């Protein structure tokens, strides 16, 4: 029905007859001339109807915005004063020689040219996607997936599909369950990831696997998380951590080069401990110059008893954040930040403004200056690197709480004061994660997942000191977002069973939940490692948006509702009966 897309027309097509299909983006009737802008996925072009074709002109007079049409026309140049530099086709226009109205349109319930509220956009998503900005994001997503496929194929990876209906396994989040009609009272689970299947493929001899795959997690949502999401899933045999990281790093460099036309700087390597200690986060945004600095040794002997008492306990930290040019913050500004950190479990922060006098000597303004010796103040200034016009924020308390509080405050200050380097990328690898950590009940759980291999530790030592074990895992972080995660896998059945035991799983439970996998490891399982990117998050970064819903064609809300189709919905009574499912009164549960 068409010979070319609207947005692809240019001066090389002058004099040619073209057939275009699309929607009326803008309509102007000047009496003897009718102008429309015709829009399709590639862009817009101006079309002119004049009285040389009376029947066509009469038909064009019926047009309104968002009518779906087909037209024939001749490409011609515009006069210089009529060139529209806001669109790529602005130097040319099409003189219509034929017009077919394919479908009329009611007035749209939203305006695709202006900002609409999120609820309206999601309810009428099919119209929201006509917005050129939204369309461009989805086109870039398609290009990114194409680039990924070509890259992985060149590296020798095979695209192999894994099941969508599988067995529920403990991977951190809740599973989405699918009841079986044939096997009453039993359920499939939608996969949180293809983790076990891709490891089984390694045992099968398919030494390089990848898949762009849907995954499902029933967890609390936020701006960069959806109940169903897409992974670039990767696994390889006879490979170590450095080698798989190099391949994944090369892939990311390739994407940034092709999409952003940027050569990424070198990827730093940083341990989990260092990241938490310096930035209060395992996914630090290194564009932000603020860093957490430990000053516990400098305040141990202060007469400020609150700080001194906290500093004496090795489980605590006393830290400072240096905020460049932060001395301009008013007392009201500081109170807002004090209120902000209280939501993280800290009752107060202490501040100190730093100035440099005419004599070159640094002076301070702070409520705690009187409790500190002059030499201690100078030591704090020297250690934090504070300069004229900076402000220092101090906090003290339990290690983990302080890391969380000051990490969050660091991010907020960086955003509020626009301290992050603009138009830059700060990629890094976070490594040497703890293998296990304790939950609120004191039970151990895997920091990544239970199939991650520990780093340089034998089984007896692992059993005796599980919290000292480091995971052979690695996360890729870009601008404060974890874009991907991976690890070297366990390929020994005995070690895998040991990990399950440490996590409190009995041998019977292991056999029931993972017996097939443990058995598979006994048949010559090769050393292997893997990685998975969150495709949605990658596309979000590459298209410079802050909401993952902007790069998904039909996303859910933060309460996991599809406003367009009104899913989830109440189950059909007959279908529920066939599945032996009874809906309980939620007030009685």
From Swiss-Prot:
SUPFAM superfamilies: Class II aaRS and biotin synthetases, GAD domain-like, Nucleic acid-binding proteins. It is found in: Cytoplasm. GO terms for molecular function: aspartate-tRNA ligase activity; ATP binding; nucleic acid binding. The keyword Acetylation does not apply. ATP binds at residues 217-219, 226, 482, 534-537. Its EC number is 6.1.1.12. It catalyses: tRNA(Asp) + L-aspartate + ATP = L-aspartyl-tRNA(Asp) + AMP + diphosphate. One of its GO terms (biological process) is aspartyl-tRNA aminoacylation. This is Aspartate--tRNA ligase.
């Amino acid at each position: 029905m068409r010979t070319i897309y609207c947005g692809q027309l240019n001066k090389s097509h002058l004099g040619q007859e073209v057939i275009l299909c699309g929607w009326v983006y803008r309509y102007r009737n000047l009496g003897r001339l009718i102008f429309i802008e015709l829009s399709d996925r590639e862009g817009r072009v101006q079309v002119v109807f004049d009285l040389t074709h009376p029947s066509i002109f009469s038909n064009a007079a019926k047009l309104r915005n968002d009518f779906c049409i087909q037209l024939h026309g001749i490409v011609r140049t515009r006069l210089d004063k009529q060139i529209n530099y806001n669109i790529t086709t602005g130097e040319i226009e099409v003189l219509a020689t034929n017009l077919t109205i394919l479908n009329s349109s009611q007035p749209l319930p939203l305006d695709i040219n202006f900002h609409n509220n999120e609820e309206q956009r999601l309810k009428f998503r099919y119209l929201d996607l006509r917005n050129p900005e939204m369309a461009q994001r989805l086109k870039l997503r398609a290009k990114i997936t194409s680039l990924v496929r070509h890259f992985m194929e060149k590296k020798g990876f095979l695209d192999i599909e894994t099941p969508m209906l599988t067995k529920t396994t403990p991977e951190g989040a809740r599973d989405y369950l699918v009841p079986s009609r044939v096997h009453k009272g039993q359920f499939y689970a939608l996969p949180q990831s293809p983790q076990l299947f891709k490891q089984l493929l390694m045992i099968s001899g398919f030494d390089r696997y990848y898949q762009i795959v849907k995954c499902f997690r029933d967890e609390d949502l936020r701006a960069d998380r959806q109940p169903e999401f897409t992974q670039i899933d990767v696994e390889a045999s006879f490979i170590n951590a450095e080698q798989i990281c190099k391949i994944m790093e090369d892939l990311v460099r390739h994407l940034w080069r092709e999409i952003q036309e940027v050569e990424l700087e070198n990827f730093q390597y940083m341990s989990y401990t260092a990241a938490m200690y310096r930035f209060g986060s395992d996914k630090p945004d290194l564009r932000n110059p603020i860093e957490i600095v430990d000053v516990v040794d400098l305040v141990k002997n202060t007469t400020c008893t609150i700080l001194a008492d906290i500093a004496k306990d090795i489980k605590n930290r006393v830290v400072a954040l240096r905020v460049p040019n932060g001395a301009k913050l008013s007392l009201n500004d500081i109170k807002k930040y004090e209120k902000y950190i209280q939501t993280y479990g800290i009752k107060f922060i202490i501040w100190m403004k730093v100035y440099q006098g005419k004599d070159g000597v640094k002076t301070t303004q702070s409520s705690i200056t009187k409790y500190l010796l002059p030499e201690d103040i100078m030591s704090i200034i020297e250690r934090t690197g504070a300069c004229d016009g900076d402000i220092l924020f101090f906090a003290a308390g339990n290690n983990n709480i302080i890391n969380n509080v000051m990490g969050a405050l660091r991010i907020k200050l960086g955003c509020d004061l626009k301290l992050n380097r603009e138009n830059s990328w700060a990629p890094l690898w976070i490594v040497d994660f703890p293998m296990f950590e304790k939950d609120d009940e004191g039970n151990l759980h895997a920091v990544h997942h239970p199939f991650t291999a520990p780093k340089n530790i034998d089984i007896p030592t692992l059993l005796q000191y599980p919290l000292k074990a480091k995971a052979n895992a690695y996360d890729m972080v870009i601008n404060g977002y974890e874009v991907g995660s991976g690890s070297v896998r366990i390929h020994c059945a005995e070690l895998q069973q040991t990990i399950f035991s440490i996590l409190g799983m009995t041998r019977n439970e292991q056999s029931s939940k993972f017996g097939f996998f443990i058995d598979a490891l006994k048949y010559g399982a090769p050393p292997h490692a893997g990685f998975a990117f969150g495709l949605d998050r990658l596309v979000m970064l590459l298209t410079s948006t802050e909401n993952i819903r902007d790069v998904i064609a039909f996303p859910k809300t933060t309460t996991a509702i599809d406003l367009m189709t009104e899913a989830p919905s109440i189950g059909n009574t007959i279908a529920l009966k066939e599945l032996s499912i009874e809906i309980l009164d939620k007030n009685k549960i």
